[in-house]
Amino acid sequence: MPSTLQALTKKVLATQPVFKDDYCILERCGLWWHEAPITIHHTCIDKQILIKTASFKHGLTLNVALMKAVQENNHGLIELFTEWGADISFGLVTVNMECTQDLCQKLGARKALSENKILEIFYNVQYVKTSSNIILCHELLSDNPLFLNNAQLKLRIFGELDTLSINFTLDNISFNEMLTRYWYSMAILYKLTEAIQYFYQRYSHFKDWRLICGVAYNNVFDLHEIYNKEKTNIDIDEMMQLACMYDCNYTTIYYCCMLGADINRAMITSVMNFCEGNLFLCIDLGADAFEESMEIASQTNNWILINILLFKNYSPDSSLLSIKTTDPEKINALLDEEKYKSKNMLIYEESLFHIYGVNI
């Protein structure tokens, strides 16, 4: 909560509609950054405060805005963001002048950050899904010694990227590059168009990485764009295998299938990764590798998958196979995760209802 009446007044003022005639008032009040007014907005889900300016039009969290203000040694904004609720400890991540460090400590920051606090800061800043936030986090943190030397963070990022590193070895790249790839992947996961373009333009040699993340994170729009824009060294069956490692990746599985990927291999991969939803989609798309899939399910004693594979009354879904499109708009409308229900899953569930008398 704001600690002074003045800070509260500024907070109320920053939430109001901004007109050009009011710019001089906002500038005098300190609600001015990078030659533009500061406004306050809130995230839809958890109502976090977002700071917006012309430079950060999609919004920054208070803590990320504070880190940027500290980097710029903007003492007025450091005090304002702290009064609005930012954690002054975050400022120690980007502090570069003794006078600014003194101000941070005066406002309550410790002299140094512990390894656990550094990890906490990383977890805190990464989850707000705006292009401005992702881009600035990359710029402030990817080459930051505090994060490059954090052993726990290295393990976390290594684990996040390990499954996706199908065409390179993580041991052969720097941690700075790992962090860059991580922020790039977050932009694709959250479907942040401006952030994706930012990374694409600056890291053109990561074109395969963009495609990999598009497949893995079910972003069929970005997958389609990059697949048709760039030559890739990744085989279509490799793409399908990656798509099948994450359940409910319906749009990218369908896209790879339409490009000619082996749907039986996709079925087997789905079983290997315990992806029930993907398994049913593969059956809808004509997969019939039941013997191989049953052998894998039996080895792991996965009775849910075993029972699904024992059922005999499956057939391809002609409504999916007849369309034959790689248009992401059409694919998304056809296989929207919240609306799509597999024809063969419905048949299987109906059979269970007849056996047990309850909906599964």
Curated annotation (Swiss-Prot):
Keywords: Early protein. Disruption phenotype: No effect on virulence. Induction: Expressed in the early phase of the viral replicative cycle. GO terms for biological process: taxis. Plays a role in virus cell tropism, and may be required for efficient virus replication in macrophages. Belongs to the asfivirus MGF 360 family. This is Protein MGF 360-1L. It comes from African swine fever virus (strain Badajoz 1971 Vero-adapted) (Ba71V). The lineage of its organism: Viruses, Varidnaviria, Bamfordvirae, Nucleocytoviricota, Pokkesviricetes.
